Amino acid sequence: MDYSIADRQMSIMDKLGILTDAAKYDVACTSSGNERKGDGTGMGNTIKAGICHSFSGDGRCISLLKILFTNECIYDCKYCVNRCSNDVPRASFTPDEVCRLTIEFYRRNYIEGLFLSSGILYSPDYTMELLYQTLYKLRREYNFQGYIHVKAIPGANQELVRMTGFLADRMSTVSYTHLRAHETR
C-alpha cells in the first residue's frame, strides 16, 4: 500500500526541529536531568532536543536520534502535548526522510541508533504501516545495523505491530486502555 504524506513546503531541518522537540516528552530514554543552556562561549547544550541516551543489554550507554514520525494526531488525550486540540506547529516526515536523517547522523558518529515514536496520523493502522515502511527501508535498503527502539501504535493491527517488531531491537507502547482513558472527544 502506498502511504504518501503531502509535502507542506517545510524543510527537513524545520521538521527535525519540530519533531525532536515534540519527542522530548517521551520518557523512554534518559537524559542528564541538567538544564544548562549553551552560552555561546563553550560547547554543549544539555536542553537541546534530538539526542537521547539509552542502555544496551550489556550496560553500555548508547546515543539515539529521538524523533517523532509526526506530531499530528487524531486523538485529544489530555496528557499529550501533541493532542489534536493543542495549537502547536505540526510536521510529518516521510519514511525516506527518517532513513536519510538516521544514516547521516550515524555516519557522522552522532548516534548509534534511532528512537522512533509518533502521533497518530489518520488511523492507527496507517501510522503503524508508515513506521513499518521506515524500519524496513532502514534495515533492508540502507542496511542499517544500528539499534532501533520503536513505539508501537495503540490500536494498530497486530500483524503490522508484529512485523515492525521483527525489524526493531526494542519495541514499547502506551497501553490502548491508557490512551482511551485520557481522551476528551
Predicted segments, located by residue:
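Canonical Radical SAM [4Fe-4S] cluster-binding loop centered on the CxxxCxxC motif
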Residues: 67-96
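Canonical radical SAM enzyme core domain
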Residues: 87-99, 125-130, 137-170
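Conserved glycine-rich "GG(E/T)P / GGGxP" loop and the immediately following alpha-helix
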Residues: 114-133
